[in-house]
């Protein structure tokens, strides 16, 4: 398992972001190796993003080489996007999941 966290500011309203995200969500549902994506939003500070749970680091790397990731990172509505990957500590995670 592998975790990716993407954060960015937005230059649209919260409501417009939610509408756009809801329209885009089906595109993420079919990405190979993506177990889940949790959409994040901090309306007060206009910071949004997602926590992606991948089957493997290789699946995450394949996503980062693809069109959807490129779109997320270069969208005119996203301000200063960042992406950070994390390995999962399996032993303690098994206890808490």
Outline where the language-model segments fall.
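Short S/T/G/P-rich N-terminal loop/turn motif that feeds into the first structured element of a domain
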Residues: 1-48, 57-65, 77-97
